[in-house]
Amino acid sequence: MGVLENIVPGELYDANYDPDLLKIRKETKIKLHEYNTLSPADENKKSQVIRELLGSCTDNFIIEPPFYCDYGSNIYIGDNFYANHNLVILDGAKVVIGDNVFIAPNVGIYTAGHPIDVERRLQGLEYAMPVTIGDNVWIGGGVSIIPGVNIGKNSVIAAGSVVIRDIPENVVAAGNPCKVIRKITEKDSTTTNYRK
């Protein structure tokens, strides 16, 4: 997959018409179709198909179908990873996800972006920036993470957030655009009532 290695983070490349990239994406779609339509009872086959797709993973992870990505080979997931249904990862650049990360349904992790000016956008040009998610992060349902974002370890991203900037470690962040709401404190480890 040398053509993917030639993509320089933040620099424009031909994502829409490059025949090598189109071929890789088609092969990825075929594997994803197989993965997303396998019986839940066929755990061994599901594991084999997803492992062929990802850049790296451990033995201990779950990605609930349906799952979608552009290439798969730019996705690196840590140990004890769980992703609920409808995870979308546009992985023109690396997506590195740490250990013990939980992702709720309908989350989008996007490394791909397009030029603002219409001329270059219509030429099929785009750029890609890596996304990194630290250990022990929980990402709520419906979150969107844009190109180039880093989320620090132990943080929580509230449902529906749009993460456009880096989020530090050990915080709760929410909103559109996503902002730090508060630090995670010792009190959080003793809370038993989560009603509002």
Curated annotation (Swiss-Prot):
| Annotated site (Transition state stabilizer) | N84
Tell me the organism: Saccharomyces cerevisiae (strain ATCC 204508 / S288c)
Q: How does it assemble?
A: Homodimer.
Q: Where does acetyl-CoA bind?
A: N84, G141, A159, I164, R165, K179, R182
| Molecular function terms from GO | galactoside O-acetyltransferase activity
Concerning its family, UniProt says: Belongs to the transferase hexapeptide repeat family.
Gene3D superfamilies (UniProt xref): Hexapeptide repeat proteins
What protein name does the entry list? Putative acetyltransferase YJL218W
Any one Pfam family match given in the protein's UniProt record, by short name: Mac
> Active site annotated at which positions?
H114 (proton donor/acceptor)
Q: Enzyme group, top EC level?
A: transferase
Q: What is its EC number?
A: 2.3.1.-
Please name the PROSITE patterns in this protein's record: HEXAPEP_TRANSFERASES
Which GO terms of the cellular component aspect does the record hold?
mitochondrion
Q: Which UniProt keywords apply?
A: Acyltransferase, Repeat, Transferase
